[in-house]
Each structure stands twice: as C-alpha cells, then as structure tokens.
Amino acid sequence: MNKPFSQACENNKVAILAALADSFSASKTVLEVGSGSGQHAVFFAPNMPWLSWQTSDILANHQGISQWLKEYPAGNLLHPIELDLNHPWPIEKIDAIYTANTLHIISWPLVQAFFSGVSQHLNQQGKCCVYGPFNYQGQYTSESNAGFDIWLKERDSQSAIRNIEAIMALAENVGLSLENDHAMPANNRLLVFQKLG
C-alpha cells in the first residue's frame, strides 16, 4: 500500500520548522493534533531532537502515519495515539501543541473543542502553534485564499478559512495569549499562543 502524500505538507515545511524550533526551544514534549499523513512529523522530529514528538489523529489515519514513521524513523518520534476532538484527549499535561491545516477543515464546534483541549492539557507557559490560512477583519489575504475558501465550503459547508479575531477570542477565553503571528509563504500564517499563568 502506498503511503498517503499531501503536497500541502511539503509546502513551507522549512519555514514552519524555523518558527517551531524557536517557539519550542524550551519544550520537551509536543503533541501534534491531526498528524494527517505523518509527513510533518517525520520532518520536524529529527530536526528538533530535544523534543519528544507525539503524533495523533483519528483512527482512520493511523495506518498512513505509521507507514511514514516506519520509513523515516526517529528516536524521538512516537507512534500515533487516537485523538478525536469530539472526545476527551488521551493524554495528561504536555509542554507544546502543534496543528497544521486543520482549523479550516473541521467544524467551528470542533475548533472550539480544540482550544478547550489545548487549555486543559498544555502546561503553564506552554506554547501552541497553529499553521494555516486566516482572514483578517473578515477579509481574505489573497485571491487564492478566497478561491480556496469557496472550494472548502463546496466540499463541506462546515469548513471555512477562519477569522483571526474569532480565533484570538476563543484562545483568550481559555487562557491563551497570542504571542506571535508569523507570515508564512503562500498566504499562510503560523500563530503562536502561550498558556498564561
């Protein structure tokens, strides 16, 4: 069986790594929420050897993630745990959380559930990095993002590029503060939240 492959995971991974390495420099453990194909995990983990990188996703995606991990093993890269945002997370506390290209795919109630889970499981002063496209003041940042949003909504009416203001409000309501908003290539962003306290 061929491994799953996502071009979106290959795009910008070097730029994402640079931002993550800075944000996660003081962390020891990271949970990747929605590891998808597993491509980000096998690239990021060996390039941040001080981290224990825990992959996770719904059970249907575990086989593909495991195929990537088998082909590109790393001592600090852990096999996926089942994480469904509709249910409690199967972890205790963790230093850092990363998710990419997820918040515009999942429904808004699941976006809310994501931030609730982050707040519950992230250690004090821990970092949460969120990669993907966002709108600012209700406006698309590019024509390509506008077209992408139309495609998303045609595919699933609950999907959409999220407004940064709504994301920040969700985060603030659960004790997370936006520390950085990094511009990424191809009209994407990397948002860095820190748990207050």
Segments predicted by a language model, with ranges:
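Class I SAM-dependent methyltransferase SAM/SAH-binding core
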Residues: L31, Q39-H87
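Conserved Class I S-adenosyl-L-methionine
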Residues: T141-E165
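A short acidic, Gly/Pro-enriched loop at the edge of an enzyme's catalytic core
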Residues: W89-I97
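A short, conserved alpha-helix within the catalytic core of class I
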Residues: I106-V118
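Conserved glycine-rich SAM-binding loop
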Residues: G36
